[in-house]
A protein has these predicted regions:
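Short, hydrophobic transmembrane alpha-helix segments
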Residues: 46-56
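Single conserved hydrophobic/aromatic residue that forms the stacking wall/gate
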Residues: 1-13, 251-254
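Helix-loop-helix junctions within the multi-pass membrane cores of secondary transporters/permeases
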Residues: 98-169
Length: 256
């Protein structure tokens, strides 16, 4: 009993140490990402683009809140999404059921994309398409191509030919889509580089490739994000063929 209790105490101490170290790491990353932009804006605010004191105060407070939010968001994503992705990927492959890998991969791709903050921002800037229609279209695109990426790892298919084929389809569709949709389509591909999507997708690939024992398994675990980024582009291009009206980004004013 004493050894078990001591073991539990040691585990908790180790976990607390890991969390503290990760917290320091994420704090440094967030500060280094936000502070340079903050300094540039303040420099412009005191020189060529004067801002009122109230706006400057709001900006500084907002920047501090952004840093705090990024710390906890990235910490939570790394401590939860990455381990979960690896375990889910390994468990999916152990089932040895192709239909289950396809179904789970698609559902996970859709859900993780809907939760992506970048997608919510993008959807709010497209005036001609309802927010939920755009969000679901992009999510389905990511889900379909996440399945394709997982099957590529599973069967050891080379990445380069797939990228050539899919991007050829993208550029072919681009010729039949209204110009207003082109910018939206290619911007939507950036959704797969968000802080929620990237850790989970990469961890999922690592989990699946870890079950394979061949020499190419490690290399095949990469390339998931590059394939998944094609999904939103194709989805929005197809959406553009349905919505033939012009799309315009709403111009958000800095201050009402």
């Amino acid at each position: 009993m004493r050894s078990s209790a001591a073991s539990d105490v040691y585990k908790r101490q180790y976990q607390n140490t890991v969390v503290r170290e990760k917290m320091k790491e994420k704090t440094k990353e967030s500060v280094s990402a936000v502070v340079p932009i903050m300094l540039i804006v303040l420099l412009l605010g005191f020189t060529i683009a004067p801002l009122s004191p109230s706006i400057l105060v709001e900006f500084i407070v907002g920047a501090v809140l952004v840093i705090i939010g990024m710390v906890f968001f990235s910490l939570g994503a790394e401590l939860s999404m990455t381990p979960m992705g690896e375990r889910v990927g390994g468990s999916m492959l152990r089932t040895k059921k192709l239909w289950m890998i396809v179904a789970i991969g698609f559902i996970l791709g859709v859900i993780i994309t809907i939760s992506e903050p970048d997608l919510q921002v993008l959807a709010g800037q497209v005036a001609a398409v309802p927010n939920m229609v755009l969000i679901l279209s992009v999510a389905v695109g990511v889900g379909v191509f996440l399945v394709a990426a997982l099957l590529r790892i599973l069967f050891g298919i080379p990445l380069a030919p797939l990228l050539l084929v899919f991007y050829a389809i993208v550029f072919a569709l681009a010729m039949f889509v209204p110009k207003g949709f082109l910018a939206v389509a290619f911007d939507s591909g950036g959704v797969t580089t968000g802080p929620m999507t990237v850790p989970f997708i990469m961890a999922l690939g690592v989990g699946i490739s870890s079950i394979r024992n061949d020499k190419h398994a490690g290399n095949d675990s990469f390339g998931l994000v590059s394939l998944c980024s094609i999904g939103p582009i194709l989805a929005v291009l197809i959406l553009g063929m349905v919505y033939s009206t012009a799309v315009s980004y709403t111009h958000l004013r800095a201050h009402e």
